[in-house]
């Protein structure tokens, strides 16, 4: 429990949290500390009793279910009988009528792009940055470092050229399957260039095009000697890096040194299961990292193998479209924030009845306020949205949507 508190409205707020909100969270926002805490005070004393009621409903349901299982211990459970029991106690509800989701301003990473989603503890800034930057990763490195590529020899710190060739072979076969060239294979191509707004693949002095020319979307560098080619498949992008001087391109006729794959399109920054935030100091650490992500200035300095390194958010990736115009692709994973559920309370704030604040309500206020910084820049959500992940909840109640701030 926090040691020092300040009285604000009908609240007792820990020094650490109060200082963070007033001096960091609200900085550069058109919300005064007076307005923020007044709104929070009104909201939490309105919603905390409802939160308590939700928990009591859950406890009553759980007790009835526990008692049923004790009573029927050792008996074969008839599914229809069990469903009837769950319906009678109000746990199961009748299916409602069909409806249409009408949510607006949702980013493509949620509506259009199917891809991996990471979950990362928000308390660890370095892990969080790694996850945010996992939008684009080296396919060569990923394959080389996993057992997708079989190897008779065990792992070694030294580079294995045979394994490296197997990686290149795997990627070329992957491209043959999903981004095929019309009339030939990706194996042993000699060069790539752009002509008449199309990707041209050279092999044995012949020119070839992709079977689906729309999969080529852009490039970087000179059209006759591009440094990167951008391919799109199923709304995910691949960046073919061309650098004949690179070590990885030493035995590649076309000078392809790597393939960068669009990977983790979204990431849940977790305030709940993967962290142990038990007091104001812990919660502020979580909130500060989320604020840094929303402001775009989160950085971490660390030492690895005797070298000092700095990790920060990657910038967007810039290219030239096939029409010759500027093209930018999102350089980072779309970040979602997972709030704590109904059950937990936290000593960061004490309410007027002496109880601890419901942690999920505190999370909702502070994480959404932090996201207002991104609304100005739109570097995370391009549509001006914040994505809050809540644990699975069971409730009879419909909570109000009163604008408290």
Language-model-detected regions and their locations in the chain:
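Catalytic alpha/beta active-site cores
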Residues: 2-3, 84, 88-397
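N-terminal-proximal low-complexity accessory segments that begin disordered
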Residues: 2-72, 84-93
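Solvent-exposed alpha-helix faces
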Residues: 41, 400-401
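Single conserved hydrophobic/aromatic residue that forms the stacking wall/gate
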Residues: 396, 402-405
């Amino acid at each position: 429990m926090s040691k020092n508190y300040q009285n604000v409205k009908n609240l007792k707020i820990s020094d650490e949290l109060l200082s963070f909100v007033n001096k960091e969270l609200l900085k550069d926002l058109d919300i005064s500390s007076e307005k923020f805490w007044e709104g929070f005070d009104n909201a939490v004393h309105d919603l905390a009793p409802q939160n308590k009621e939700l928990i009591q409903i859950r406890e009553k349901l759980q007790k009835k279910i526990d008692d049923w299982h004790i009573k029927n211990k050792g008996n074969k459970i008839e599914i229809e009988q069990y469903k009837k029991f769950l319906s009678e106690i109000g746990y199961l509800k009748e299916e409602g009528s069909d409806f249409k989701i009408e949510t607006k301003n949702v980013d493509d990473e949620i509506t259009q792009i199917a891809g991996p989603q990471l979950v990362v503890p928000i308390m660890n800034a370095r892990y969080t940055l790694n996850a945010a930057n996992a939008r684009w990763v080296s396919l060569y490195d990923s394959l080389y470092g996993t057992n997708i590529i079989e190897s008779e020899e065990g792992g070694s710190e030294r580079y294995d050229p045979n394994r490296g060739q197997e990686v290149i072979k795997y990627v070329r076969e992957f491209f043959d399957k999903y981004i095929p060239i019309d009339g030939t294979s990706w194996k042993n191509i000699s060069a790539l260039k752009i002509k008449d707004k199309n990707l041209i693949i050279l092999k044995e002095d012949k020119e070839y095009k992709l079977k689906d020319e729309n999969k080529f979307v852009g490039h970087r560098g000179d059209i006759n000697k591009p440094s990167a080619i951008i391919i799109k498949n199923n709304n995910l992008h691949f960046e073919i890096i061309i650098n004949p001087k690179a070590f990885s391109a030493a035995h590649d006729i076309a000078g392809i040194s790597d393939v960068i794959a669009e990977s983790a399109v979204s990431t849940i920054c977790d305030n709940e299961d993967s962290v142990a935030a038990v007091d104001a100091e812990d919660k502020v650490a979580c909130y500060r990292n989320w604020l840094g992500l929303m402001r775009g200035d989160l950085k971490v300095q660390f030492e690895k193998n005797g070298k000092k390194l700095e990790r920060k958010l990657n910038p967007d990736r810039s290219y030239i479209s096939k029409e010759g115009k500027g093209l930018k692709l999102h350089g980072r994973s779309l970040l979602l924030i997972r709030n704590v559920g109904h059950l937990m309370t936290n000593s960061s704030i004490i309410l007027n009845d002496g109880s601890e604040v419901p942690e999920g309500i505190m999370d909702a206020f502070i994480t959404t306020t932090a996201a207002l910084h991104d609304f100005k820049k739109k570097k995370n959500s391009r549509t001006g949205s914040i994505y809050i992940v809540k644990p699975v909840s069971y409730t009879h109640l419909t909570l109000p949507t009163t604008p408290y701030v």
